[in-house]
Every structure is written in structure tokens, then in C-alpha cells.
Amino acid sequence: MAKEAARVKRRERKNIASGVAHVNASFNNTMITITDAQGNTISWSSAGAMGFKGSRKSTPYAAQLAAEDAARKAAEHGMRTLEVEVSGPGSGRESALRALQAAGFLVTSIRDVTPIPHNGCRPRKRRRV
């Protein structure tokens, strides 16, 4: 009886024509979440979820594979057009955007929503290599 309640319906919604792709490119990883216009998650993927570990997660190639995976899952729901919101300073920003365009989506707008402080918290110390 408990097993019946534990079942979760997956991917029940179809035919969502347009959505928003949120690309979060940090120094350590790149996460891509594709939502509908209201912000409900349709699909997501990340470089870590694609099997990359450690410093390989922050590469542009890992971001490209993650974007292709998220795009393929979103295309199963009938998504055709995307607005892209890019956030963060990571190296996977451009490659994730190119992968979304190459997956056959019509990108209508690209926004940079990286949070920029108006002299807020003290930043972490500079790296000396």
C-alpha cells in the first residue's frame, strides 16, 4: 500500500511551445534549467549530471553536453522557442547558448542576469598562481 503512494507521475505535461532557459555558469559547474513562462521546471541538466567530475565540470564542452541534454528533454514536451537568461562568470556561458541554438530552438532573446553588487559583501581573496 505504501508503494502505491510513493509513485510519482513524470512528464505528464506536453505541448509547451515556448519557455525560458536559465544558464547558471559558475566557476565550478554549469547548470541549465528550462522552465515555462511561469517558472515551472520542464527539464534541467548540469555538467555534473552528465558524468563530469572535478575541474572537468567547468569546461565549455561539459556545458555544451549539459545544454544538449536539457534541450532534448524539453523538446519532448514540444518546446520550440526559448528566451535565454545567462548568469554567472563561468566558461560555459557561450557554449551552452550555442548548443541550445544548435539543438533547433529559436532563441528570441538573450539576457545577462548576473547579480552585480553595489559594493555589498567583501569579495574573496585573489588567487595567486
From Swiss-Prot:
Gene3D superfamilies: Ribosomal protein S11
UniProt xrefs under Pfam families: Ribosomal_S11
GO molecular function: rRNA binding; structural constituent of ribosome
The keyword RNA-binding belongs to this UniProt entry's keyword annotation: yes
An individual GO BP term: translation
Any one annotated GO CC term: ribonucleoprotein complex
Subunit structure as annotated in this protein's UniProt entry: Part of the 30S ribosomal subunit. Interacts with proteins S7 and S18. Binds to IF-3.
Family per record: Belongs to the universal ribosomal protein uS11 family.
Function of the protein: Located on the platform of the 30S subunit, it bridges several disparate RNA helices of the 16S rRNA. Forms part of the Shine-Dalgarno cleft in the 70S ribosome.
Protein name: Small ribosomal subunit protein uS11
Organism for this UniProt entry: Azorhizobium caulinodans (strain ATCC 43989 / DSM 5975 / JCM 20966 / LMG 6465 / NBRC 14845 / NCIMB 13405 / ORS 571)
